[in-house]
Structures are given as structure tokens and as C-alpha cells.
């Protein structure tokens, strides 16, 4: 009996030992599996975090790009809308074109006292005010020949007016748009002409500088006519020449045409940087570049000019002018293209109205850099004027 129970007991003990060993192994395996899964989760979480951060950064960058593109597109649409709107605005408000042509609101240089030409280095110049019409007053400068500058000190307006009767020729200078009679390049030209023995009379059209009135082609021409008659009433038989620059050439040919029609022509007409007519000049002007090929350019931009009564038809006026004509033009003129000055000469030269008078065209090479308003710098200018107009009276005291 005892022998049979021992094996059973031993068997049970082995089974128990085996069972406890199996359960321990299973528990260890289970713990290992859990640990492995936890490690895998941690590893997965660690690798996922950089990916999610990278994705967020890319999203932010894309967002910024979209926002920038949206703003850029908005700006482009605004510019395009503005570009398209301007022609319609000009067509509906022709006065805008008149403002851009006259530019009388641009006063350069600023802060100068036009009552004091001596502040601009013109110490032999007198400031006048004339009244062409009831509600119009224009400021005038009269610069005498430079050899009289000492005698001119402290003299009044009457002395200057009497000086016009001296035996020296007179140039009536008609300036272009923008600025005043005190513009830098204009003052330098007065000095050159004065040094050559000429009286120089210039003025600001109504609406320019300190002159009172509203600008218009008719008004500008009438102002010039009034000043011319004022000069002739005081100058006796002295030669009177008319010099127009840029837009002033339009005023000059309007004036001379009227003078010729009433049979009181000037002794000569000088046109510096002239154009043919205001339509061709406006089409060739640098400001028109961005619209020059715009559909309906003439209808939108040029027709409003003529509908405002602005023509400045130099080409048409040439057919009615009978006096010597000198045209000066720089090849590198960026404002009034050289070819317009040449074209005007080609219209005038064969005209019957000039058949008994000298017509001359003087080009200035682009290498000289005289552009639109610096022809006065040319050392050849005194010779050109002397040969065309004749030698001015020898210098003498007044």
C-alpha cells in the first residue's frame, strides 16, 4: 500500500511542479508581450510626433502662400480696374485733360517771390502787372540788355518801359506748360539773351504763377497779344521777335497768325521744341505710353482735348504766317519728339506764306544732351541767332 501511494504522490508533486513552472513561463511570456506592445506604442508615438509637426509646418507655409497670392491677386485686380476706369473718367470729365496739358498747378521752383526777379539772379529785371481783360491780371518780367545792369539799379517801372525805345531788339518769350516765368531753365535763357543785347519780356499766362484767371487756349493767346501790343506801343521801330517754347510754340503760332492777319507781323518767329498739333503731341507724349495701344485711344483721350477747345494747331497756323521762321529742336527731346519738329518744318518750308521769308531748322545732336529745355546751353546759340536775326545793336549805356 505504501509503495503504491508514493508514486502517486511523486507524480502529483511533479505535476504540481510542472504546473507551477508552466504558469510561471506563461506569466513571464505575457509580461514580455505586454512590455513589447508598450514599447511599440511608445516607439510609434515618438515617430508620429515629428510627422505631425512637419505636416503642420507645411500647412502653415501653404496657408501663407495662399494668403500672399490672394493679396497679390487683389492688388492686381485693383490696378487693372483703375487702369480701365481712367479712360472712362477722362472721357466723362474732359477738364482732366485740360489740367494735364496746362499743368499750371505745378509751380516749380516752389517758394519763390515772383515780385522779386533779383532773387533769381536777374538784377536788371523789373516786375510788372498788366490787365488784358477785366478779371484777368498777368505778371510780367522785363529784362534789359545786361550791359545796362548798373544803370538799372533802383530804377522804377517807367524807366524800364522807356528803355524799350532804345535801339535794341526785343524778344517776347512765351514759356511752356508747368512752372512759372521764374523756372530755372527759363531764367538761364533770359540771361543768355540779355547778354547778347536783347530786351526779354516774358509773362505768366492767366492761371500760372501769380497771374489771375482761368487757363484756356483762347485766353493764353489773348494774353500774348496784349503783351505784344503793350511792347509795340513803347518800342517804336525796334525789332520785336517772338520766341515760343514747347506748349508756348502753340501760343506763339496762334499769336503770329493773328498778327499776320491784321498785317502787323513780328520781325521773326522762333520756335523751340515745337510740335505739329496738340493731338499728335499728346499721342507722342511719354505719359501716353501705357494707353497708346488701348482700344479707342483717340476717342477716350484725344477727342476730349479738342472738345475742350484745345487745338494748338501749329501745322495749320503755318499756312497763315508770313515772317522769318527759325525752329530749334534737340534730337533727344523726350517730351516733344524730334520728328514732330522736323515735320512742322517740312510743312512750313514749302508753304506759299513763307515764300518770301527765310525758314530754317536747326537740330541739336543727341550727344549734346540738351533734351527738352537745355538748348540755351549751346555755345552755338549766339552764332545761330546772330546769323538768323542779324547782329543786335552794339552795347552802349542807356
From Swiss-Prot:
Chain ranges on the Extracellular side, renumbered to this chain: 96-398
Signal sequence annotation: none
Molecular function (Gene Ontology), one example: phospholipase activity
Localization annotation: Endoplasmic reticulum membrane
Enzyme nomenclature, EC number: 3.1.-.-, 3.1.1.23
Catalytic residues in the record: 246 (nucleophile), 333 (charge relay system), 372 (charge relay system)
Cytoplasmic side: 1-74
Coiled-coil region: none
Transmembrane segments: 75-95
Pfam assignment, any one: Abhydrolase_1
GO biological process per UniProt: acylglycerol catabolic process; adult walking behavior; glycerophospholipid catabolic process; monoacylglycerol catabolic process; phosphatidylserine catabolic process; phospholipid catabolic process; regulation of inflammatory response; response to auditory stimulus
Top-level EC class: hydrolase
Keywords of this entry: Endoplasmic reticulum, Glycoprotein, Hydrolase, Lipid metabolism, Membrane, Transmembrane, Transmembrane helix
Region described as Disordered: spans on this chain: 1-24
Regions of compositional bias (Basic and acidic residues) in chain numbering: 1-15
Membrane topology category: Single-pass membrane protein
InterPro entries: AB_hydrolase_1 (IPR000073), AB_hydrolase_fold (IPR029058)
Catalyzed chemical reaction(s): 1-(9Z-octadecenoyl)-sn-glycero-3-phospho-L-serine + H2O = sn-glycero-3-phospho-L-serine + (9Z)-octadecenoate + H(+); 1-(9Z-octadecenoyl)-sn-glycero-3-phospho-(1'-sn-glycerol) + H2O = sn-glycero-3-phospho-(1'-sn-glycerol) + (9Z)-octadecenoate + H(+); 1-(9Z-octadecenoyl)-sn-glycero-3-phospho-(1D-myo-inositol) + H2O = sn-glycero-3-phospho-1D-myo-inositol + (9Z)-octadecenoate + H(+); 1-(9Z-octadecenoyl)-sn-glycero-3-phosphoethanolamine + H2O = sn-glycero-3-phosphoethanolamine + (9Z)-octadecenoate + H(+)
Main subcellular localisation: endoplasmic reticulum
Residues annotated as glycosylated: 123
One GO cellular component, as annotated: AMPA glutamate receptor complex
Function field: Lysophosphatidylserine (LPS) lipase that mediates the hydrolysis of lysophosphatidylserine, a class of signaling lipids that regulates immunological and neurological processes. Represents a major lysophosphatidylserine lipase in the brain, thereby playing a key role in the central nervous system. Also able to hydrolyze oxidized phosphatidylserine; oxidized phosphatidylserine is produced in response to severe inflammatory stress and constitutes a proapoptotic 'eat me' signal.
UniProt family annotation: Belongs to the serine esterase family.
Protein name (database record): Lysophosphatidylserine lipase ABHD12
Annotated organism of origin: Rattus norvegicus (Rat)
